Amino acid sequence: MELSLVRGIVPRTVFGLTAIAAIILIIGLALSKSKKRGRLHPLIVSLIAAVLAGAAGLLVAWLVSDVFMVFGVSLGWPVIFTIAGGIAGVGFVIAAAVTLRGVRRALAVVLVPLVLLSTALGVDSIYGEYQTIGTLVGYTPYASLGSIEVHKAAMSVSDWHSKARKGSLPSMPSQGKVLTVDIPNTESNFTARKAMIYLPPAALSDRPPALPVMELLAGQPGSPSRLIDAGNIAATMNAYAAKHDGLAPIVLVPDQNGEATHNSLCADTTQGNAETYLTTDVVNWAKKMLPVAKSARMWAMGGFSQGGTCTTQLVPRHPDIYGALLPVDGELKPTNGSVAKMVQEYFAGDRKAYDEQVPVNAIAATGTPEQALFTGAGERDKESISNMRTIADAARKAGMEVTELIVPGTGHDWHAVQAVWRPGLDWFGERTGLGEMTKSLKEYPQVEVLQ
C-alpha cells in the first residue's frame, strides 16, 4: 500500500512492460501482410488510427481543460499532451487488435489496459497528487494521536535553544510523527473528517517547548491525508528538525470541506460553519491539547488551490490568531459555480456576506502590517500567477511583508506546493525563532523570486 506511484518500481515496471509490449506489437504489425491486395498495410492502419485518436483526444482534453474549465483550472499542456498521447496509444492498439490474429491480437488487447495505466501514471507524475498505492483508496498508515502521550509545553523556543547550546536537551526521537485525530466541533457543529497532525521530535519529548503552528489545508477535491502525502510534509519537516535540534512547526491539517466532493467555501454558511471550525474549534483544541505557542506571530495558515483561497480569506479576517499566510496556486475568491449561485445557496441571498469572504476585501478590511504573506504559483498556471499578483498587491497596501515565488516547470500541482513550502518553512522558522535562514530566497534552486 505504501509503494510509490511517482517513482521507483511501480511506474518503472508499468512503463517498461508497456514499452516492451508496444515494441513487440509494432514488429508484429510490420511483419504482417494485408489480407487483400490494395488494402493498407496493418501498421499504416494502426498509425492512422493513432493520429486520429490522438487528435481527437487532444481536442477533447483542451476543451475540457481550457474552454469549459470543468475542473475550475487549466490542466496544463503537459497533462493535455499526456492524455492525448495515451488516447493515441489506445487507438493504435485497438486498430492492431482488429487487423491482427492469434497471439498478436492477444498482445494488442493486453496493451490497452497497460497504455491506460501508463497514461494515468504519467498524469499523476505531473500532478504529484497520488503518491502511493494506498492513497488511491484512502489508506493511511498513520496511528491515532491517542496512541501516544503528548506533554504540555514546559519552556519557550528560546529556552530550548539555550539547552541545546549547553547539551542538556530532554530526550526525544530522531524523527517526528504523523498522526490522525478527530478534532471536536464544539462551537461550529461542522461535520469534518479526521484531521492529520505532524509533531516534530521536540514536541514528542517529555518537556517540549511551545512550538509555532502551520495550519495547512488541502485543495478540493482533496483530504487531510492527501496534503500530508502529496505535500511531502513529514520528510520536509523531519529534514528541518534534523538541522534545528529537533525543532520544527507543529503541522495541523484539518478538513475544511467535510467530504472530497463538497466545497464549504471555508465560510460560515447555510451548508456548515467551516470558518468557525477552522479558526475556533481547531485552534482552541490545539492550544489545549498540544505544546503550541499562543501568539498570532507563531501561527500560520497555508494551503493549495482551494486551500490557498481559504488561507487568503481567513487569515486577514483573524489577525488575532494568525500572523502569516503561505498559499500556493490559490483563487481570487471562494468559488463553486457562479457568484449569484453561491450567494443564494451558501449565504441565503446575502451578497455582502459573500463579498466579505473575497480575499482582497478581507485584506483591505482587517489585514494588518503584523501579518506577512509568503505565496507562490506554478509557472504554467497563468491564472494562479495572476491571482497571486492581485492578492499580493492588496497585502502590500495593507502594510504586509510580501514574498512572491514562481516555480519553473510546474503548474497547478503538488510539485509547486513542495517547492514553495520548502523555503516557506525556513522563512516561517526564522520568523518564529526556530532558526535563521542560511541562504537567501534567490539561492533556492526550484523557485524564482518575484518580490
Positions of PLM-derived features:
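Non-catalytic cap/lid and distal C-terminal segments of serine-dependent acyl enzymes
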Residues: 1-451
